[in-house]
Amino acid sequence: MKGLVIRISVALALLLWAVDMVFPWQQIIRSEANHYEAIQERGTLVVGTINNSVSYFIDPNGNPAGLEYDLSKSFADYLGVELEIKSLDNSDALFDALQNNKIDIAAANLLHQQRYQKQFQFGPAYTSASWQLVYRKGKDKPRSLTQLSAKDKLVITQSEELLNILSAQQKKQPTLSWQINSLLSQEALLLQVAEGKIDYTIANSIDVSAAQQIKPEIAVAFDITDEADVHWYLPSSSYSELQAALLDFMNGAIENGLIARIEEKYFSHIAQFDYVDIKSYTNAIEKILPKYTALFKKYQGELDWRLLAAVAYQESHWNEDATSPTGVRGIMMLTKATADRMKINDRTDAEQSIKAGSEYLHWLISQVPNSVPQEDKIWYALTAYNMGLGHMLDVRRLTKSLGGDPDNWLEVKKNLPLLAEKQYYSKLKYGYARGYEAFQYVENIRRYMNSIINYHRVRDDQISRPLEKVTDSIMITPQNSQD
């Protein structure tokens, strides 16, 4: 009997303890399980990100843009709610905000970190990236972290992941030291490397490629880590409607081509990097473009003036006296026939050339079938600007004959090189064309346009908010690393 009483007492105590322990967890689980409902009730999806040239930025027209913004906006539309963006300084700030329910999703080209598996949920991977050690071109290129000396200035942004990587290396290499600057973004540190203010930083490979388009002095020494999946982070929960909704959205985005279109918009141009070309171009942005900016703005019409400027650079490198062996002339490199059609008499007059080039490009846009999405018509028009309207229509026909969608720019552009292959052009109305050149032509213009946008964005940001000094940072040495 005594044993039974003891067992009952113990069982009762355990039951009370279990109730006491489980009840708050039930509240937490209930709260987490209702995270999706909370978003629906408030009518807003709150996404945390980082302001840079890939994830999120305000474009020259004052509109939000960036890969993570476009993807987040599409997901918010899928949920039937508004999107609220919270821009934070670094990944640690994002994870802290997510942990404290200040944001619903963290999205900033974040690499997969297994150690966060219990704290957060992972969304589907949509690309991959690695951590890279970056230095200034022209200086000695280190081959490994062991080649960094105590006098080298390695500065990183606030990142627990990077701190763990470097701390592990420091155990094998006691002389390794670095600074953590919580005031500067990853992009800002990359710019400081380019300007020679610091020796090295470590950055996400996606952000490195983007920064190189405006600061070609940025060079990659080596990858610190292997490539890892990039995905969104969500609040942790034993059951999550939000994660299920995101999975369904991402599956649909892959099937309908949304992911491919967003990646093409923000990634295709940064995949190409030619130091000499980009260096010459950024010099031209500084020294030559200001001479013609007013004219590009005056005659931009329905176009972004930066796109018109990019076309002119691709055509003539902003040389109003340019002449080719085939007879095209001027800053927009117009043929005599096009000049006559646009009713100008001096192709080497910059204003006449820019005006005619813009009007001709607008006319080409009007010739693109209305079945093509409005935002993609410009790429078809640029293809026609380069190789002729007939060949542009030919590549649409070819795409359809190969089972593709002629209204999908991604499918059409990959078929452009086929216009130079006899088995294909022999069956087309307008015959042979250097389609591979047209492909590169459009890619270059997109890259040049984005470089102008980001060059001015960085410049304006530095003017309005001068970079904090590198000395405003925490120095990590072997001694305080072990404390």
UniProtKB/Swiss-Prot annotation:
Which controlled-vocabulary keywords does the entry list?
Answer: Cell outer membrane, Cell wall biogenesis/degradation, Lyase, Membrane, Signal
**Enzyme class of the recorded protein, top EC level:** lyase
Ranges where the record places region LT domain: 272-483
**SMART domains assigned:** PBPb (SM00062)
Listed GO biological process terms: cell wall macromolecule catabolic process; cell wall organization; peptidoglycan catabolic process
The record's section on CDD domains has:
MLTF-like, PBP2_YfhD_N
Its recorded reaction(s) are: Exolytic cleavage of the (1->4)-beta-glycosidic linkage between N-acetylmuramic acid (MurNAc) and N-acetylglucosamine (GlcNAc) residues in peptidoglycan, from either the reducing or the non-reducing ends of the peptidoglycan chains, with concomitant formation of a 1,6-anhydrobond in the MurNAc residue
What is the membrane topology noted in the UniProt record heading this document? Peripheral membrane protein
Task: Give one GO term, molecular function aspect.
Answer: peptidoglycan lytic transglycosylase activity
The EC number(s) this enzyme carries: 4.2.2.n1
Query: How far does the signal peptide extend, from start to end residue?
Result: 1-18
Keyword match Magnesium: no
- Which HAMAP family is this protein grouped with? MltF
Q: Which family does it belong to?
A: In the N-terminal section; belongs to the bacterial solute-binding protein 3 family.
Q: What is known of its domains?
A: The N-terminal domain does not have lytic activity and probably modulates enzymatic activity. The C-terminal domain is the catalytic active domain.
Q: What is this protein called?
A: Membrane-bound lytic murein transglycosylase F
Could you tell me which species this protein originates from? Actinobacillus succinogenes (strain ATCC 55618 / DSM 22257 / CCUG 43843 / 130Z)
